A protein has these predicted regions:
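Bacterial N-terminal signal peptides that target proteins for export
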Residues: 2-10
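Bacterial N-terminal signal peptides
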Residues: 10-19
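Bacterial Sec-dependent N-terminal signal peptides
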Residues: 18-35
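N-terminal zymogen propeptides
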Residues: 30-62
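Conserved beta-strand positions
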Residues: 128, 184, 235-238, 278-281
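Active-site neighborhood of glycoside hydrolase catalytic domains
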Residues: 211-218, 222-229, 239-292
Length: 292
């Protein structure tokens, strides 16, 4: 019988919390602290007749032996980076649709996604855009100015449009899950900072490195004033893909220069402890983050 990879993946991910085999094959360890005889799992199949559907029968952990399924080997002596959480992106367009739902439906959905109930997904991490993403109603930054004007002191900085939908939804999510971690990612700086003065493409002009670093500081501080803690930021969404609106091209050298010359010092000066994540794109170009 052909195994459906999506179906088995759902099983493996759930099973890993209860059962694992060590490198000495033949030994199976059960996490007895959970006192669970069965592992629940959710199923998705290629036909989409089932999409993340919880199954009525689970896996009997008492009868699992090595070789029953493909083995998941965990070497507790080999440790890599810590996981901050699991979740998804919440863009402005999604926030707008959530905001426009009736209150009871929105509450039910947010509790299903972020709550701590038995049937909740319990997402623990969110990624939001700093300014507009390409899935917002229209492109914007937090310091848009008429052509020819600049504001290196960020006197005109304002969360603006995000106060309509995104921030109210984030506040509701935080009420449900106070410990949720939120990462901010910019699709583009204000157009006046860029080589082409456009929301699409272009590059960040070096003379505005300090201004853009202050832009990040103002963002984190302004969100904190709204009761929203930004635990991490990325420097640029998809830095090598500059065709969306908004977007910007940013090489690894440019990213390294911006962080070392301006963003890092600005974070230190303003006691910002948010993580800085490098290369906000697919894991297909490991040389980019390594070089930064």
């Amino acid at each position: 019988m052909k195994k459906n990879p999506l179906s088995w993946l759902a099983l493996y991910i759930t099973s890993i919390f209860l059962v694992f085999s060590c490198k000495n094959e033949g030994e199976v360890y059960i996490n007895k602290n959970l006192n669970a005889d069965y592992v629940d799992f959710w199923l998705s199949d290629e036909s989409e007749s089932k999409i993340f559907s919880k199954q009525t029968t689970g896996v009997d952990t008492g009868r699992v032996t090595v070789g029953t399924f493909e083995n998941i080997i965990i070497d507790t002596n080999q440790v890599y980076q810590e996981m901050d959480g699991f979740g998804f992106a919440l863009n402005g367009g999604s926030a707008m649709h959530l905001f426009n739902m009736d209150q009871s439906s929105r509450s039910a959905l947010l509790n299903e996604l972020f709550g701590n109930n038995e049937n909740s997904i319990k997402a623990s991490y969110l990624r939001v855009s700093i300014g507009a993403s390409d899935l917002d109603e229209y492109p914007f930054s937090y310091n848009d100015l008429p052509d020819g004007e600049t504001d290196i002191g960020m006197d005109n900085f304002d969360l603006g449009y995000d106060k309509l939908y995104l921030i109210p939804i984030l506040k509701q999510i935080i009420e449900i899950s106070p410990d949720i971690k939120i990462m901010g990612s910019p699709w583009s700086p204000p157009a006046w900072m860029k080589t082409n003065k456009n929301t699409i493409g272009g590059s960040l002009l070096p003379e505005y490195y300090d201004a853009y670093a202050l832009y990040f500081v103002k963002y984190i501080e302004s969100m904190k004033n709204e009761g929203i803690i930004i635990s991490a930021i990325t420097i640029q969404n998809e830095p090598l893909h500059d065709g969306n609106n908004p977007s910007m091209h940013m090489t690894s050298l440019e990213q390294a220069s911006f962080i070392s010359q301006s963003l890092g010092p600005a974070f230190l000066q303003n006691q910002i402890d948010a993580k800085i994540i490098i290369y906000d794109l697919n894991a297909d170009n490991i040389e980019y983050p390594i070089s930064v």
